[in-house]
Amino acid sequence: MTEFKHTTVLLEETVNGLDVKEDGIYVDCTLGGGGHSRLILSKLGENGHLYSFDQDQTAIDYNQKNLAEYVAKGQVTFVKSNFRNLKNELNHLGIDGVDGVLYDLGVSSPQFDDAGRGFSYRFDAPLDMRMDQTQKLNAREVVNEWSYNDLVRIFFRYGEEKYSKQVARKIESTREEKPIETTGELADLIKSAIPAAARRTGGHPAKKIFQAIRIAVNDELGALEESLEQALQILNPAGRISVITFQSLEDRLVKRMFKEQTEIGDLPAGLPIIPDDMKPKYKLINRKPIIPSEDELEENRRSHSAKLRIIEKL
């Protein structure tokens, strides 16, 4: 079995934010290394249940053993699916309401550290970046077959890369000679396309482009928006959603969606009281995002960009 070692970020804060009830029904939309799932399960009584989603079979296989004590007790159900299928998958299992939903977004450490998965510019590996290894679209297809305009669009939108046009132009001219096959080739190409002065600041020059391609391959923002909409719909009264984001695009999406659900819209002038059907049906648990402590930042450098937002259904 492939090891799936992963240091869970904001573990206590995220699970405590769910206010777990012993007999509640909970969903971990991002099983990964099982850290959040384990802590939720430890708080459940015999009538409580957890549904843990992951589109990566490696994570499911690892946690069959990692969480074996809870598997044996029948308290956890693993669901191999993209969390954009949240409502459908739960309906198939006879569940139409839940007491809490957790998201720990981004690529887990084992996916980054497994050179063969092609997520990282730190290793030279075939271009892949699929979280679900059964899906057809991969990074090689994006880099070699998508048009110049489509590449510029995703580099700007998902990578917020200032030099999107230069990188896309370099990719276009390079692939005319031969296909771009590996992460190493792509990283070198990006580095050569970005001006030397810009390469000296802001970390590795390939970071933003790799992020953009990964988001495009996995449709991460589309999946998140669809899933959050479903999670809000199936939440029981007093149920909560905890979301950890790791980059500004995700955080802005979550912040916007939570704001829409917790603020009163435009009201008619002179209205003496607010009708019940116009009152918000959700409230924010934390107005500002919760971030890792200094101790956690020292122990886990990958936690530095994490932000936790929590919402509750009234």
From Swiss-Prot:
Q: What class of enzyme is it?
A: transferase
Sorted alphabetically, the Gene Ontology cellular component annotations on this record are:
cytoplasm
Keywords from the named record: Cytoplasm, Methyltransferase, rRNA processing, S-adenosyl-L-methionine, Transferase
Quote the catalytic activity from the record.
cytidine(1402) in 16S rRNA + S-adenosyl-L-methionine = N(4)-methylcytidine(1402) in 16S rRNA + S-adenosyl-L-homocysteine + H(+)
Cell compartments where the protein resides = Cytoplasm
Q: Name one GO molecular function term.
A: rRNA (cytosine-N4-)-methyltransferase activity
GO BP annotation list = rRNA base methylation
Query: Record-annotated residues binding S-adenosyl-L-methionine?
Result: G34, G35, H36, D54, F83, D104, Q111
Keyword Metal-binding among UniProt keywords: no
Q: A Pfam family this protein belongs to? A: Methyltransf_5
Q: What is its EC number?
A: 2.1.1.199
What the protein does? Specifically methylates the N4 position of cytidine in position 1402 (C1402) of 16S rRNA.
Q: Which PANTHER family match?
A: 12S RRNA N4-METHYLCYTIDINE METHYLTRANSFERASE (PTHR11265:SF0), S-ADENOSYL-METHYLTRANSFERASE MRAW (PTHR11265)
Family the UniProt entry places it in: Belongs to the methyltransferase superfamily. RsmH family.
State the protein's name.
Answer: Ribosomal RNA small subunit methyltransferase H
Q: Which organism is it from?
A: Pediococcus pentosaceus (strain ATCC 25745 / CCUG 21536 / LMG 10740 / 183-1w)
